[in-house]
Amino acid sequence: MSSTELPETRTAASPATRSRAVRVADGEELRSVALPGLTLTVRARPGTTAGLAPALYVHGLGGSSQNWSALMPLVSDLVDGEALDLPGFGDSPPPDDADYSVTGHARAVIRYLDAAGRGPVHLVGNSLGGAVSTRVAAVRPDLVRTLTLISPALPELRAQKSAWPTALLAVPGVAGLFARLTREWTAEQRVRGVLSLCYGDPRQVTDEGFRHAVEEMERRLELPYFWDAMARSSRGIVDAYTLGGQHGLWRQAERVLAPTLLVYGGRDQLVSYRMAHRAAATFRGSRLLTLPEAGHVAMMEYPEQVAAALRELITDAADVTSAEGGS
């Protein structure tokens, strides 16, 4: 289970309901992409030269495209990067059909890639985004050059106790109850709670980083649909965990053809470190990076190490493609 950032909120797509502006780092570009029944915010980090292969980054539950701002510039000489705000998260409004299932999120990613004509991409997912990316890679291998999964939310027989509160959000009524019980919590309190849950060592966060996180939390607290998006997405993860047969996530992981990098943190309180070896055995020919001091968001905690492993994956895959006479 996963929860990269806490309360975020806002209504549908009407510009009149939007709150304060979302932060955009130097070198990033933010745009809105309208699809039938769906509007997605895309955070772009253009490659340093023209013609680079495209990459797409997919965040986790409660997260946003900002989760990739530390990693994207470290590989911008290698890929032309874009990070999505999944429907109902970040600066993307809820989907018209209110489908927050893993399949629904995967469908949003596929629809964006098809509409943009960017595939195949180097697909990178964290947590819920890892489950979504696994499903995309399994059902649409033509869209994926390589797959990188950072603490992917894949089913566990014994979920860690620290992940139970996230699962409880899936129970009808619990999200509303939690919202009422925590109404008096400040943005600072919420951010500290998120950091203690998601980081291996919250002291790594700089004062500036903490301030930006608080500002983003304040923005989200002004939005009216956060708890519904969180509850429905949490329910979507639980449903995906219990789904069997050909649609089960582990079964789909076996079908992934793209070269795969798996990243796990030794201090992850949401996705168990012990799942690393099962994942490595399931994704064919995969490589594994374990970071003993990392928590649930290694790309934010140790971006240099993750970038180095991602760079190696992409370079090796390109070498194989060239040797086979591909493009």
Model-derived regions: residue spans:
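Alpha/beta-hydrolase fold catalytic core
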Residues: M1-A55, S76-D80, R107, R118-G119, ...
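Short beta-strand/loop motif that positions the catalytic acidic residue
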Residues: V256, L262-Y264
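Acidic catalytic loop of the alpha/beta-hydrolase fold
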Residues: L243-G244, R267-V271
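Conserved acidic catalytic loop of the alpha/beta-hydrolase fold
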Residues: T103-V121
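Catalytic active-site module of serine/aspartate enzymes centered on a nucleophile-bearing elbow/loop
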Residues: T282-S327
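Conserved alpha/beta-hydrolase catalytic His-Asp/Glu region
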Residues: E184-Q252
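Flexible "cap/lid" loop of the alpha/beta hydrolase fold
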Residues: A138, T146-E184
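Conserved HGGG/HGGXW glycine-rich cap/lid loop of the alpha/beta-hydrolase fold
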Residues: L38, A44-P93, M300
